[in-house]
Curated annotation (Swiss-Prot):
The gene is RP9. This is Retinitis pigmentosa 9 protein. Its main location: nucleus. Residues 1-76, 147-221 are annotated as: Disordered. Residues 1-155 are annotated as: PIM1-binding. GO terms for biological process: cognition; RNA splicing. GO terms for molecular function: RNA binding; zinc ion binding. Is thought to be a target protein for the PIM1 kinase. May play some roles in B-cell proliferation in association with PIM1. Residues 1-10, 17-29, 60-69, 147-156 have a biased composition (Basic and acidic residues). Signal peptide: none annotated. It is found in: Nucleus.
Length: 221
């Protein structure tokens, strides 16, 4: 008998991996290619950054100005000097094609102002009087709008006053007409009384005259 293993032994020992479908294999190769390309780009960027950050060859270093040198080295300033020595030196990433200030807001993530500035759309207005003063000095249309509102208010007040005066004048006229009617009625009554008194006086005179004539006639007889 031969010592060579049979086909069954070979199949059991070195079983091949099942072949992937063509679509999955193509996708896997694309993913590997993309990762390789990204790694190459990252290495290239690192090389450029390190190249530009390195000093030119043959540079003789002199006394370098350290950021902590702006604070005098006296007792009590150790914490501030240490903070400046380990402070970050890189600035913010700037947007491409925009000329902005070297600052970025933490709230709205926009460039050109800091957190808490009045230019921020998320700025919380505090003192209303100070805000009105600022708007009046910064916005040229503020005075015109305020004058227009004041003029409209004055016109409305004048209209209401005119309506009130008209209503009061109508009431006065009605009251005056009623009082005039009462006075006329009183005058008529007075005239009637005066006429009655005159008539009564005339009657009394006539009676006296008749009685005097009758007395004279009786005396003559």
């Amino acid at each position: 008998m031969s010592s060579r293993p049979g086909r069954e032994d070979v199949g059991a020992a070195g079983a091949r991996r099942p072949r992937e479908p063509p679509e999955q294999e193509l996708q896997r190769r694309r993913e590997q290619k993309r990762r390789r390309h990204d790694a190459q780009q990252l290495q290239q960027l690192k090389h450029l950054e390190s190249f530009y950050e390195k000093p030119p060859p043959g540079l003789i270093k002199e006394d370098e100005t350290k950021p902590e040198d702006c604070i005098p080295d006296v007792p009590g300033n150790e914490h501030a000097r240490e903070f400046l020595a380990h402070a970050p030196t890189k600035g913010l990433w700037m947007p491409l094609g925009k000329e902005v200030k070297v600052m970025q807001c933490w709230r709205c993530k926009r460039y050109g102002h800091r957190t808490g500035d009045k230019e921020c759309p998320f700025f919380i207005k505090g003192n209303q009087k100070l805000e009105q003063f600022r708007v009046a000095h910064e916005d040229p249309m503020y005075d015109i709008i305020r004058d227009n509102k004041r003029h409209e208010k004055d016109v409305r007040i004048q209209q209401l006053k005119q309506l009130l005066e008209d209503s009061t004048s109508d009431e006065d006229r009605s009251s005056s007409s009623s009082s005039e009617g009462k006075e006329k009625h009183k005058k008529k009554k007075k005239k009637e009384k005066h006429k009655k008194r005159k008539k009564e006086k005339k009657k009394k005179k006539k009676r006296k005259h008749k009685s005097s004539k009758s007395n004279e006639g009786s005396d003559s007889e």
